[in-house]
Amino acid sequence: MKKLSILILFLMSLSLAPTISSAATACPSIVNWDGVELKSGQIGRVLIQKPTTIYKNVNGTFEFSRVAQPGENYRVYANKSTYYHLGGGLIIQESSSILYQTPSKQKLDCAKSAPTTLTIGNTESSVKSKLGTSQNSVLNEFGTTTSIYHKNYSNFYAISLLNNKIASLYTKDKHYQVNGISITNTISQLESKLGKNYETTGNTYPIEVITYQLPKYEANFFIDVHNDNKISAILLVDYQLINKNPNLYPKPSSTLEASYETLLFELVNAERKVQGVSVLQNSSKIAAVAKKHSADMGKNNYFNHDNLKGESPFDRLANGGVQFRNAGENIAMGYTNPYFAHEALMNSLGHRKNIVSTAYTQLGVGAHFAKWTYGSIPYYTENFIKP
C-alpha cells in the first residue's frame, strides 16, 4: 500500500535441509450446467437420493456436520478414495444413497478458464455466489474481518467487507481478472491497460509492487522477480477502508497477532499450491517457538536468526521440544500486513526456497507487534520442519 514506501523493511532466511491448447468453441463468462453455475474447480455434483451424513474435515478427523436430505444437490471439488469433497471442508462418502454426476469436458474446460471478476463494491451475495463459503476469517489491520476462500488452497481469495460490500480483495487465482489484468500478466501488459502513472515499492529495480491510485480504490500488483517479472498476486483496497486506519501501523492486539499468523500460514500454503508442491501442516508447538522469537526480537530491538543468547533457530526448535530432520526459518519485520510480508519473502531466493521446499511438511508462524516511533511494528517468524 502507499504508506509502505517510507517503511524500514527487513527479510532474512536460514535453512537446514537436503503446453499450448485451443478451444473449439468460445466460452461464456458464466458456465451453466442444467441451469446452475458450474464453478471454477468444480468437477461434478452429488444428488442426494436418501438421507446421508455430511462430515467436516477437522484437522484430518471426519466429524459429523449434518444430514443431507433427498433432493439436495452439492458441488464436488475433489474425489478422493471413496469420499467426495464438497468445499468448505465438507465431505460425503460414496454410497447408494447419492448419485454422482460429471459435466461434459467442454463445460469443465470452460469453467476452468472462466475469469473471476469480483471487485471493490461488489455485494456480499456476489462473493458467496462466486466463491461459496469461507474457510476461515481473521482480523485485519483496519479493524474489520477478512474472510479466506479457497478450494484445498487453489483459487485463493482473502476478502473484507464494509457495509456488506467488498472493501478489500487479495487473490492468487490465475483466473481472476480486474480492469482486464490477470495474474501472470507482465509489467508491460499491466502498463498497456492502466498506463504508467503508478508508484513502486522496493528497490528502484527490480520492481516488487506496482500501485495504482484508481478512482475508488488502490490497486496493488505484486511482481514476481523470479518469474519473468509477472504478476503473482493482486490486492485491491477501498479508500474508505484505508481511512479507517490512518496510522502507519495498526493498533496491536493479541487477536491481530493471531490473525496475522493465521493469514501468513494460509498464504504459504496458497503459494505452495500455485508452485505445485504439497501443503504444510500447521503446528502449534512450532508456532510457539516462532512466536517467542518474534517477541524476543521486538522487545530487545534486534533482527537476526540467532537470538541474544546465541541460540540458532535449530537450538530454539530443539529447546521447544520440536524434533526435526530438516528445518528452516524466515524472518521479516516492518510489513504492515501479511500480504506484503509474504510477497516480499517470495522475491528473496532464500526465503522463497523455504516457502516452496519439498523438504518440509510442517510450519509454525509467530507474529509480534513491538513499540516503535510510529506505533507498533510487526515482526514475523516462519519455522519450517520435517520430523
Show which residues each predicted segment covers.
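Extracytoplasmic Gram-positive cell-surface binding/anchoring modules and repeats
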Residues: 60-83, 113-126, 130-139, 180-187, ...
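Amphipathic N-proximal alpha-helical interface segments
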Residues: 92-95, 105-107, 139-179, 209-252, ...
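A well-ordered secondary-structure block
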Residues: 161-163, 168-219, 313-387
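Second-shell loop/turn segments in exported
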Residues: 111-117, 174-181, 249-259, 273-283, ...
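Short, well-ordered surface patches within globular domains
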Residues: 256-315, 361-363
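Beta-loop motif signature
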Residues: 24-106
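A cross-family detector of function-defining hotspots
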Residues: 108-114, 119-162, 188-229, 358, ...
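Sec-dependent N-terminal signal peptides of Gram-positive bacterial secreted proteins and lipoproteins
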Residues: 1-24
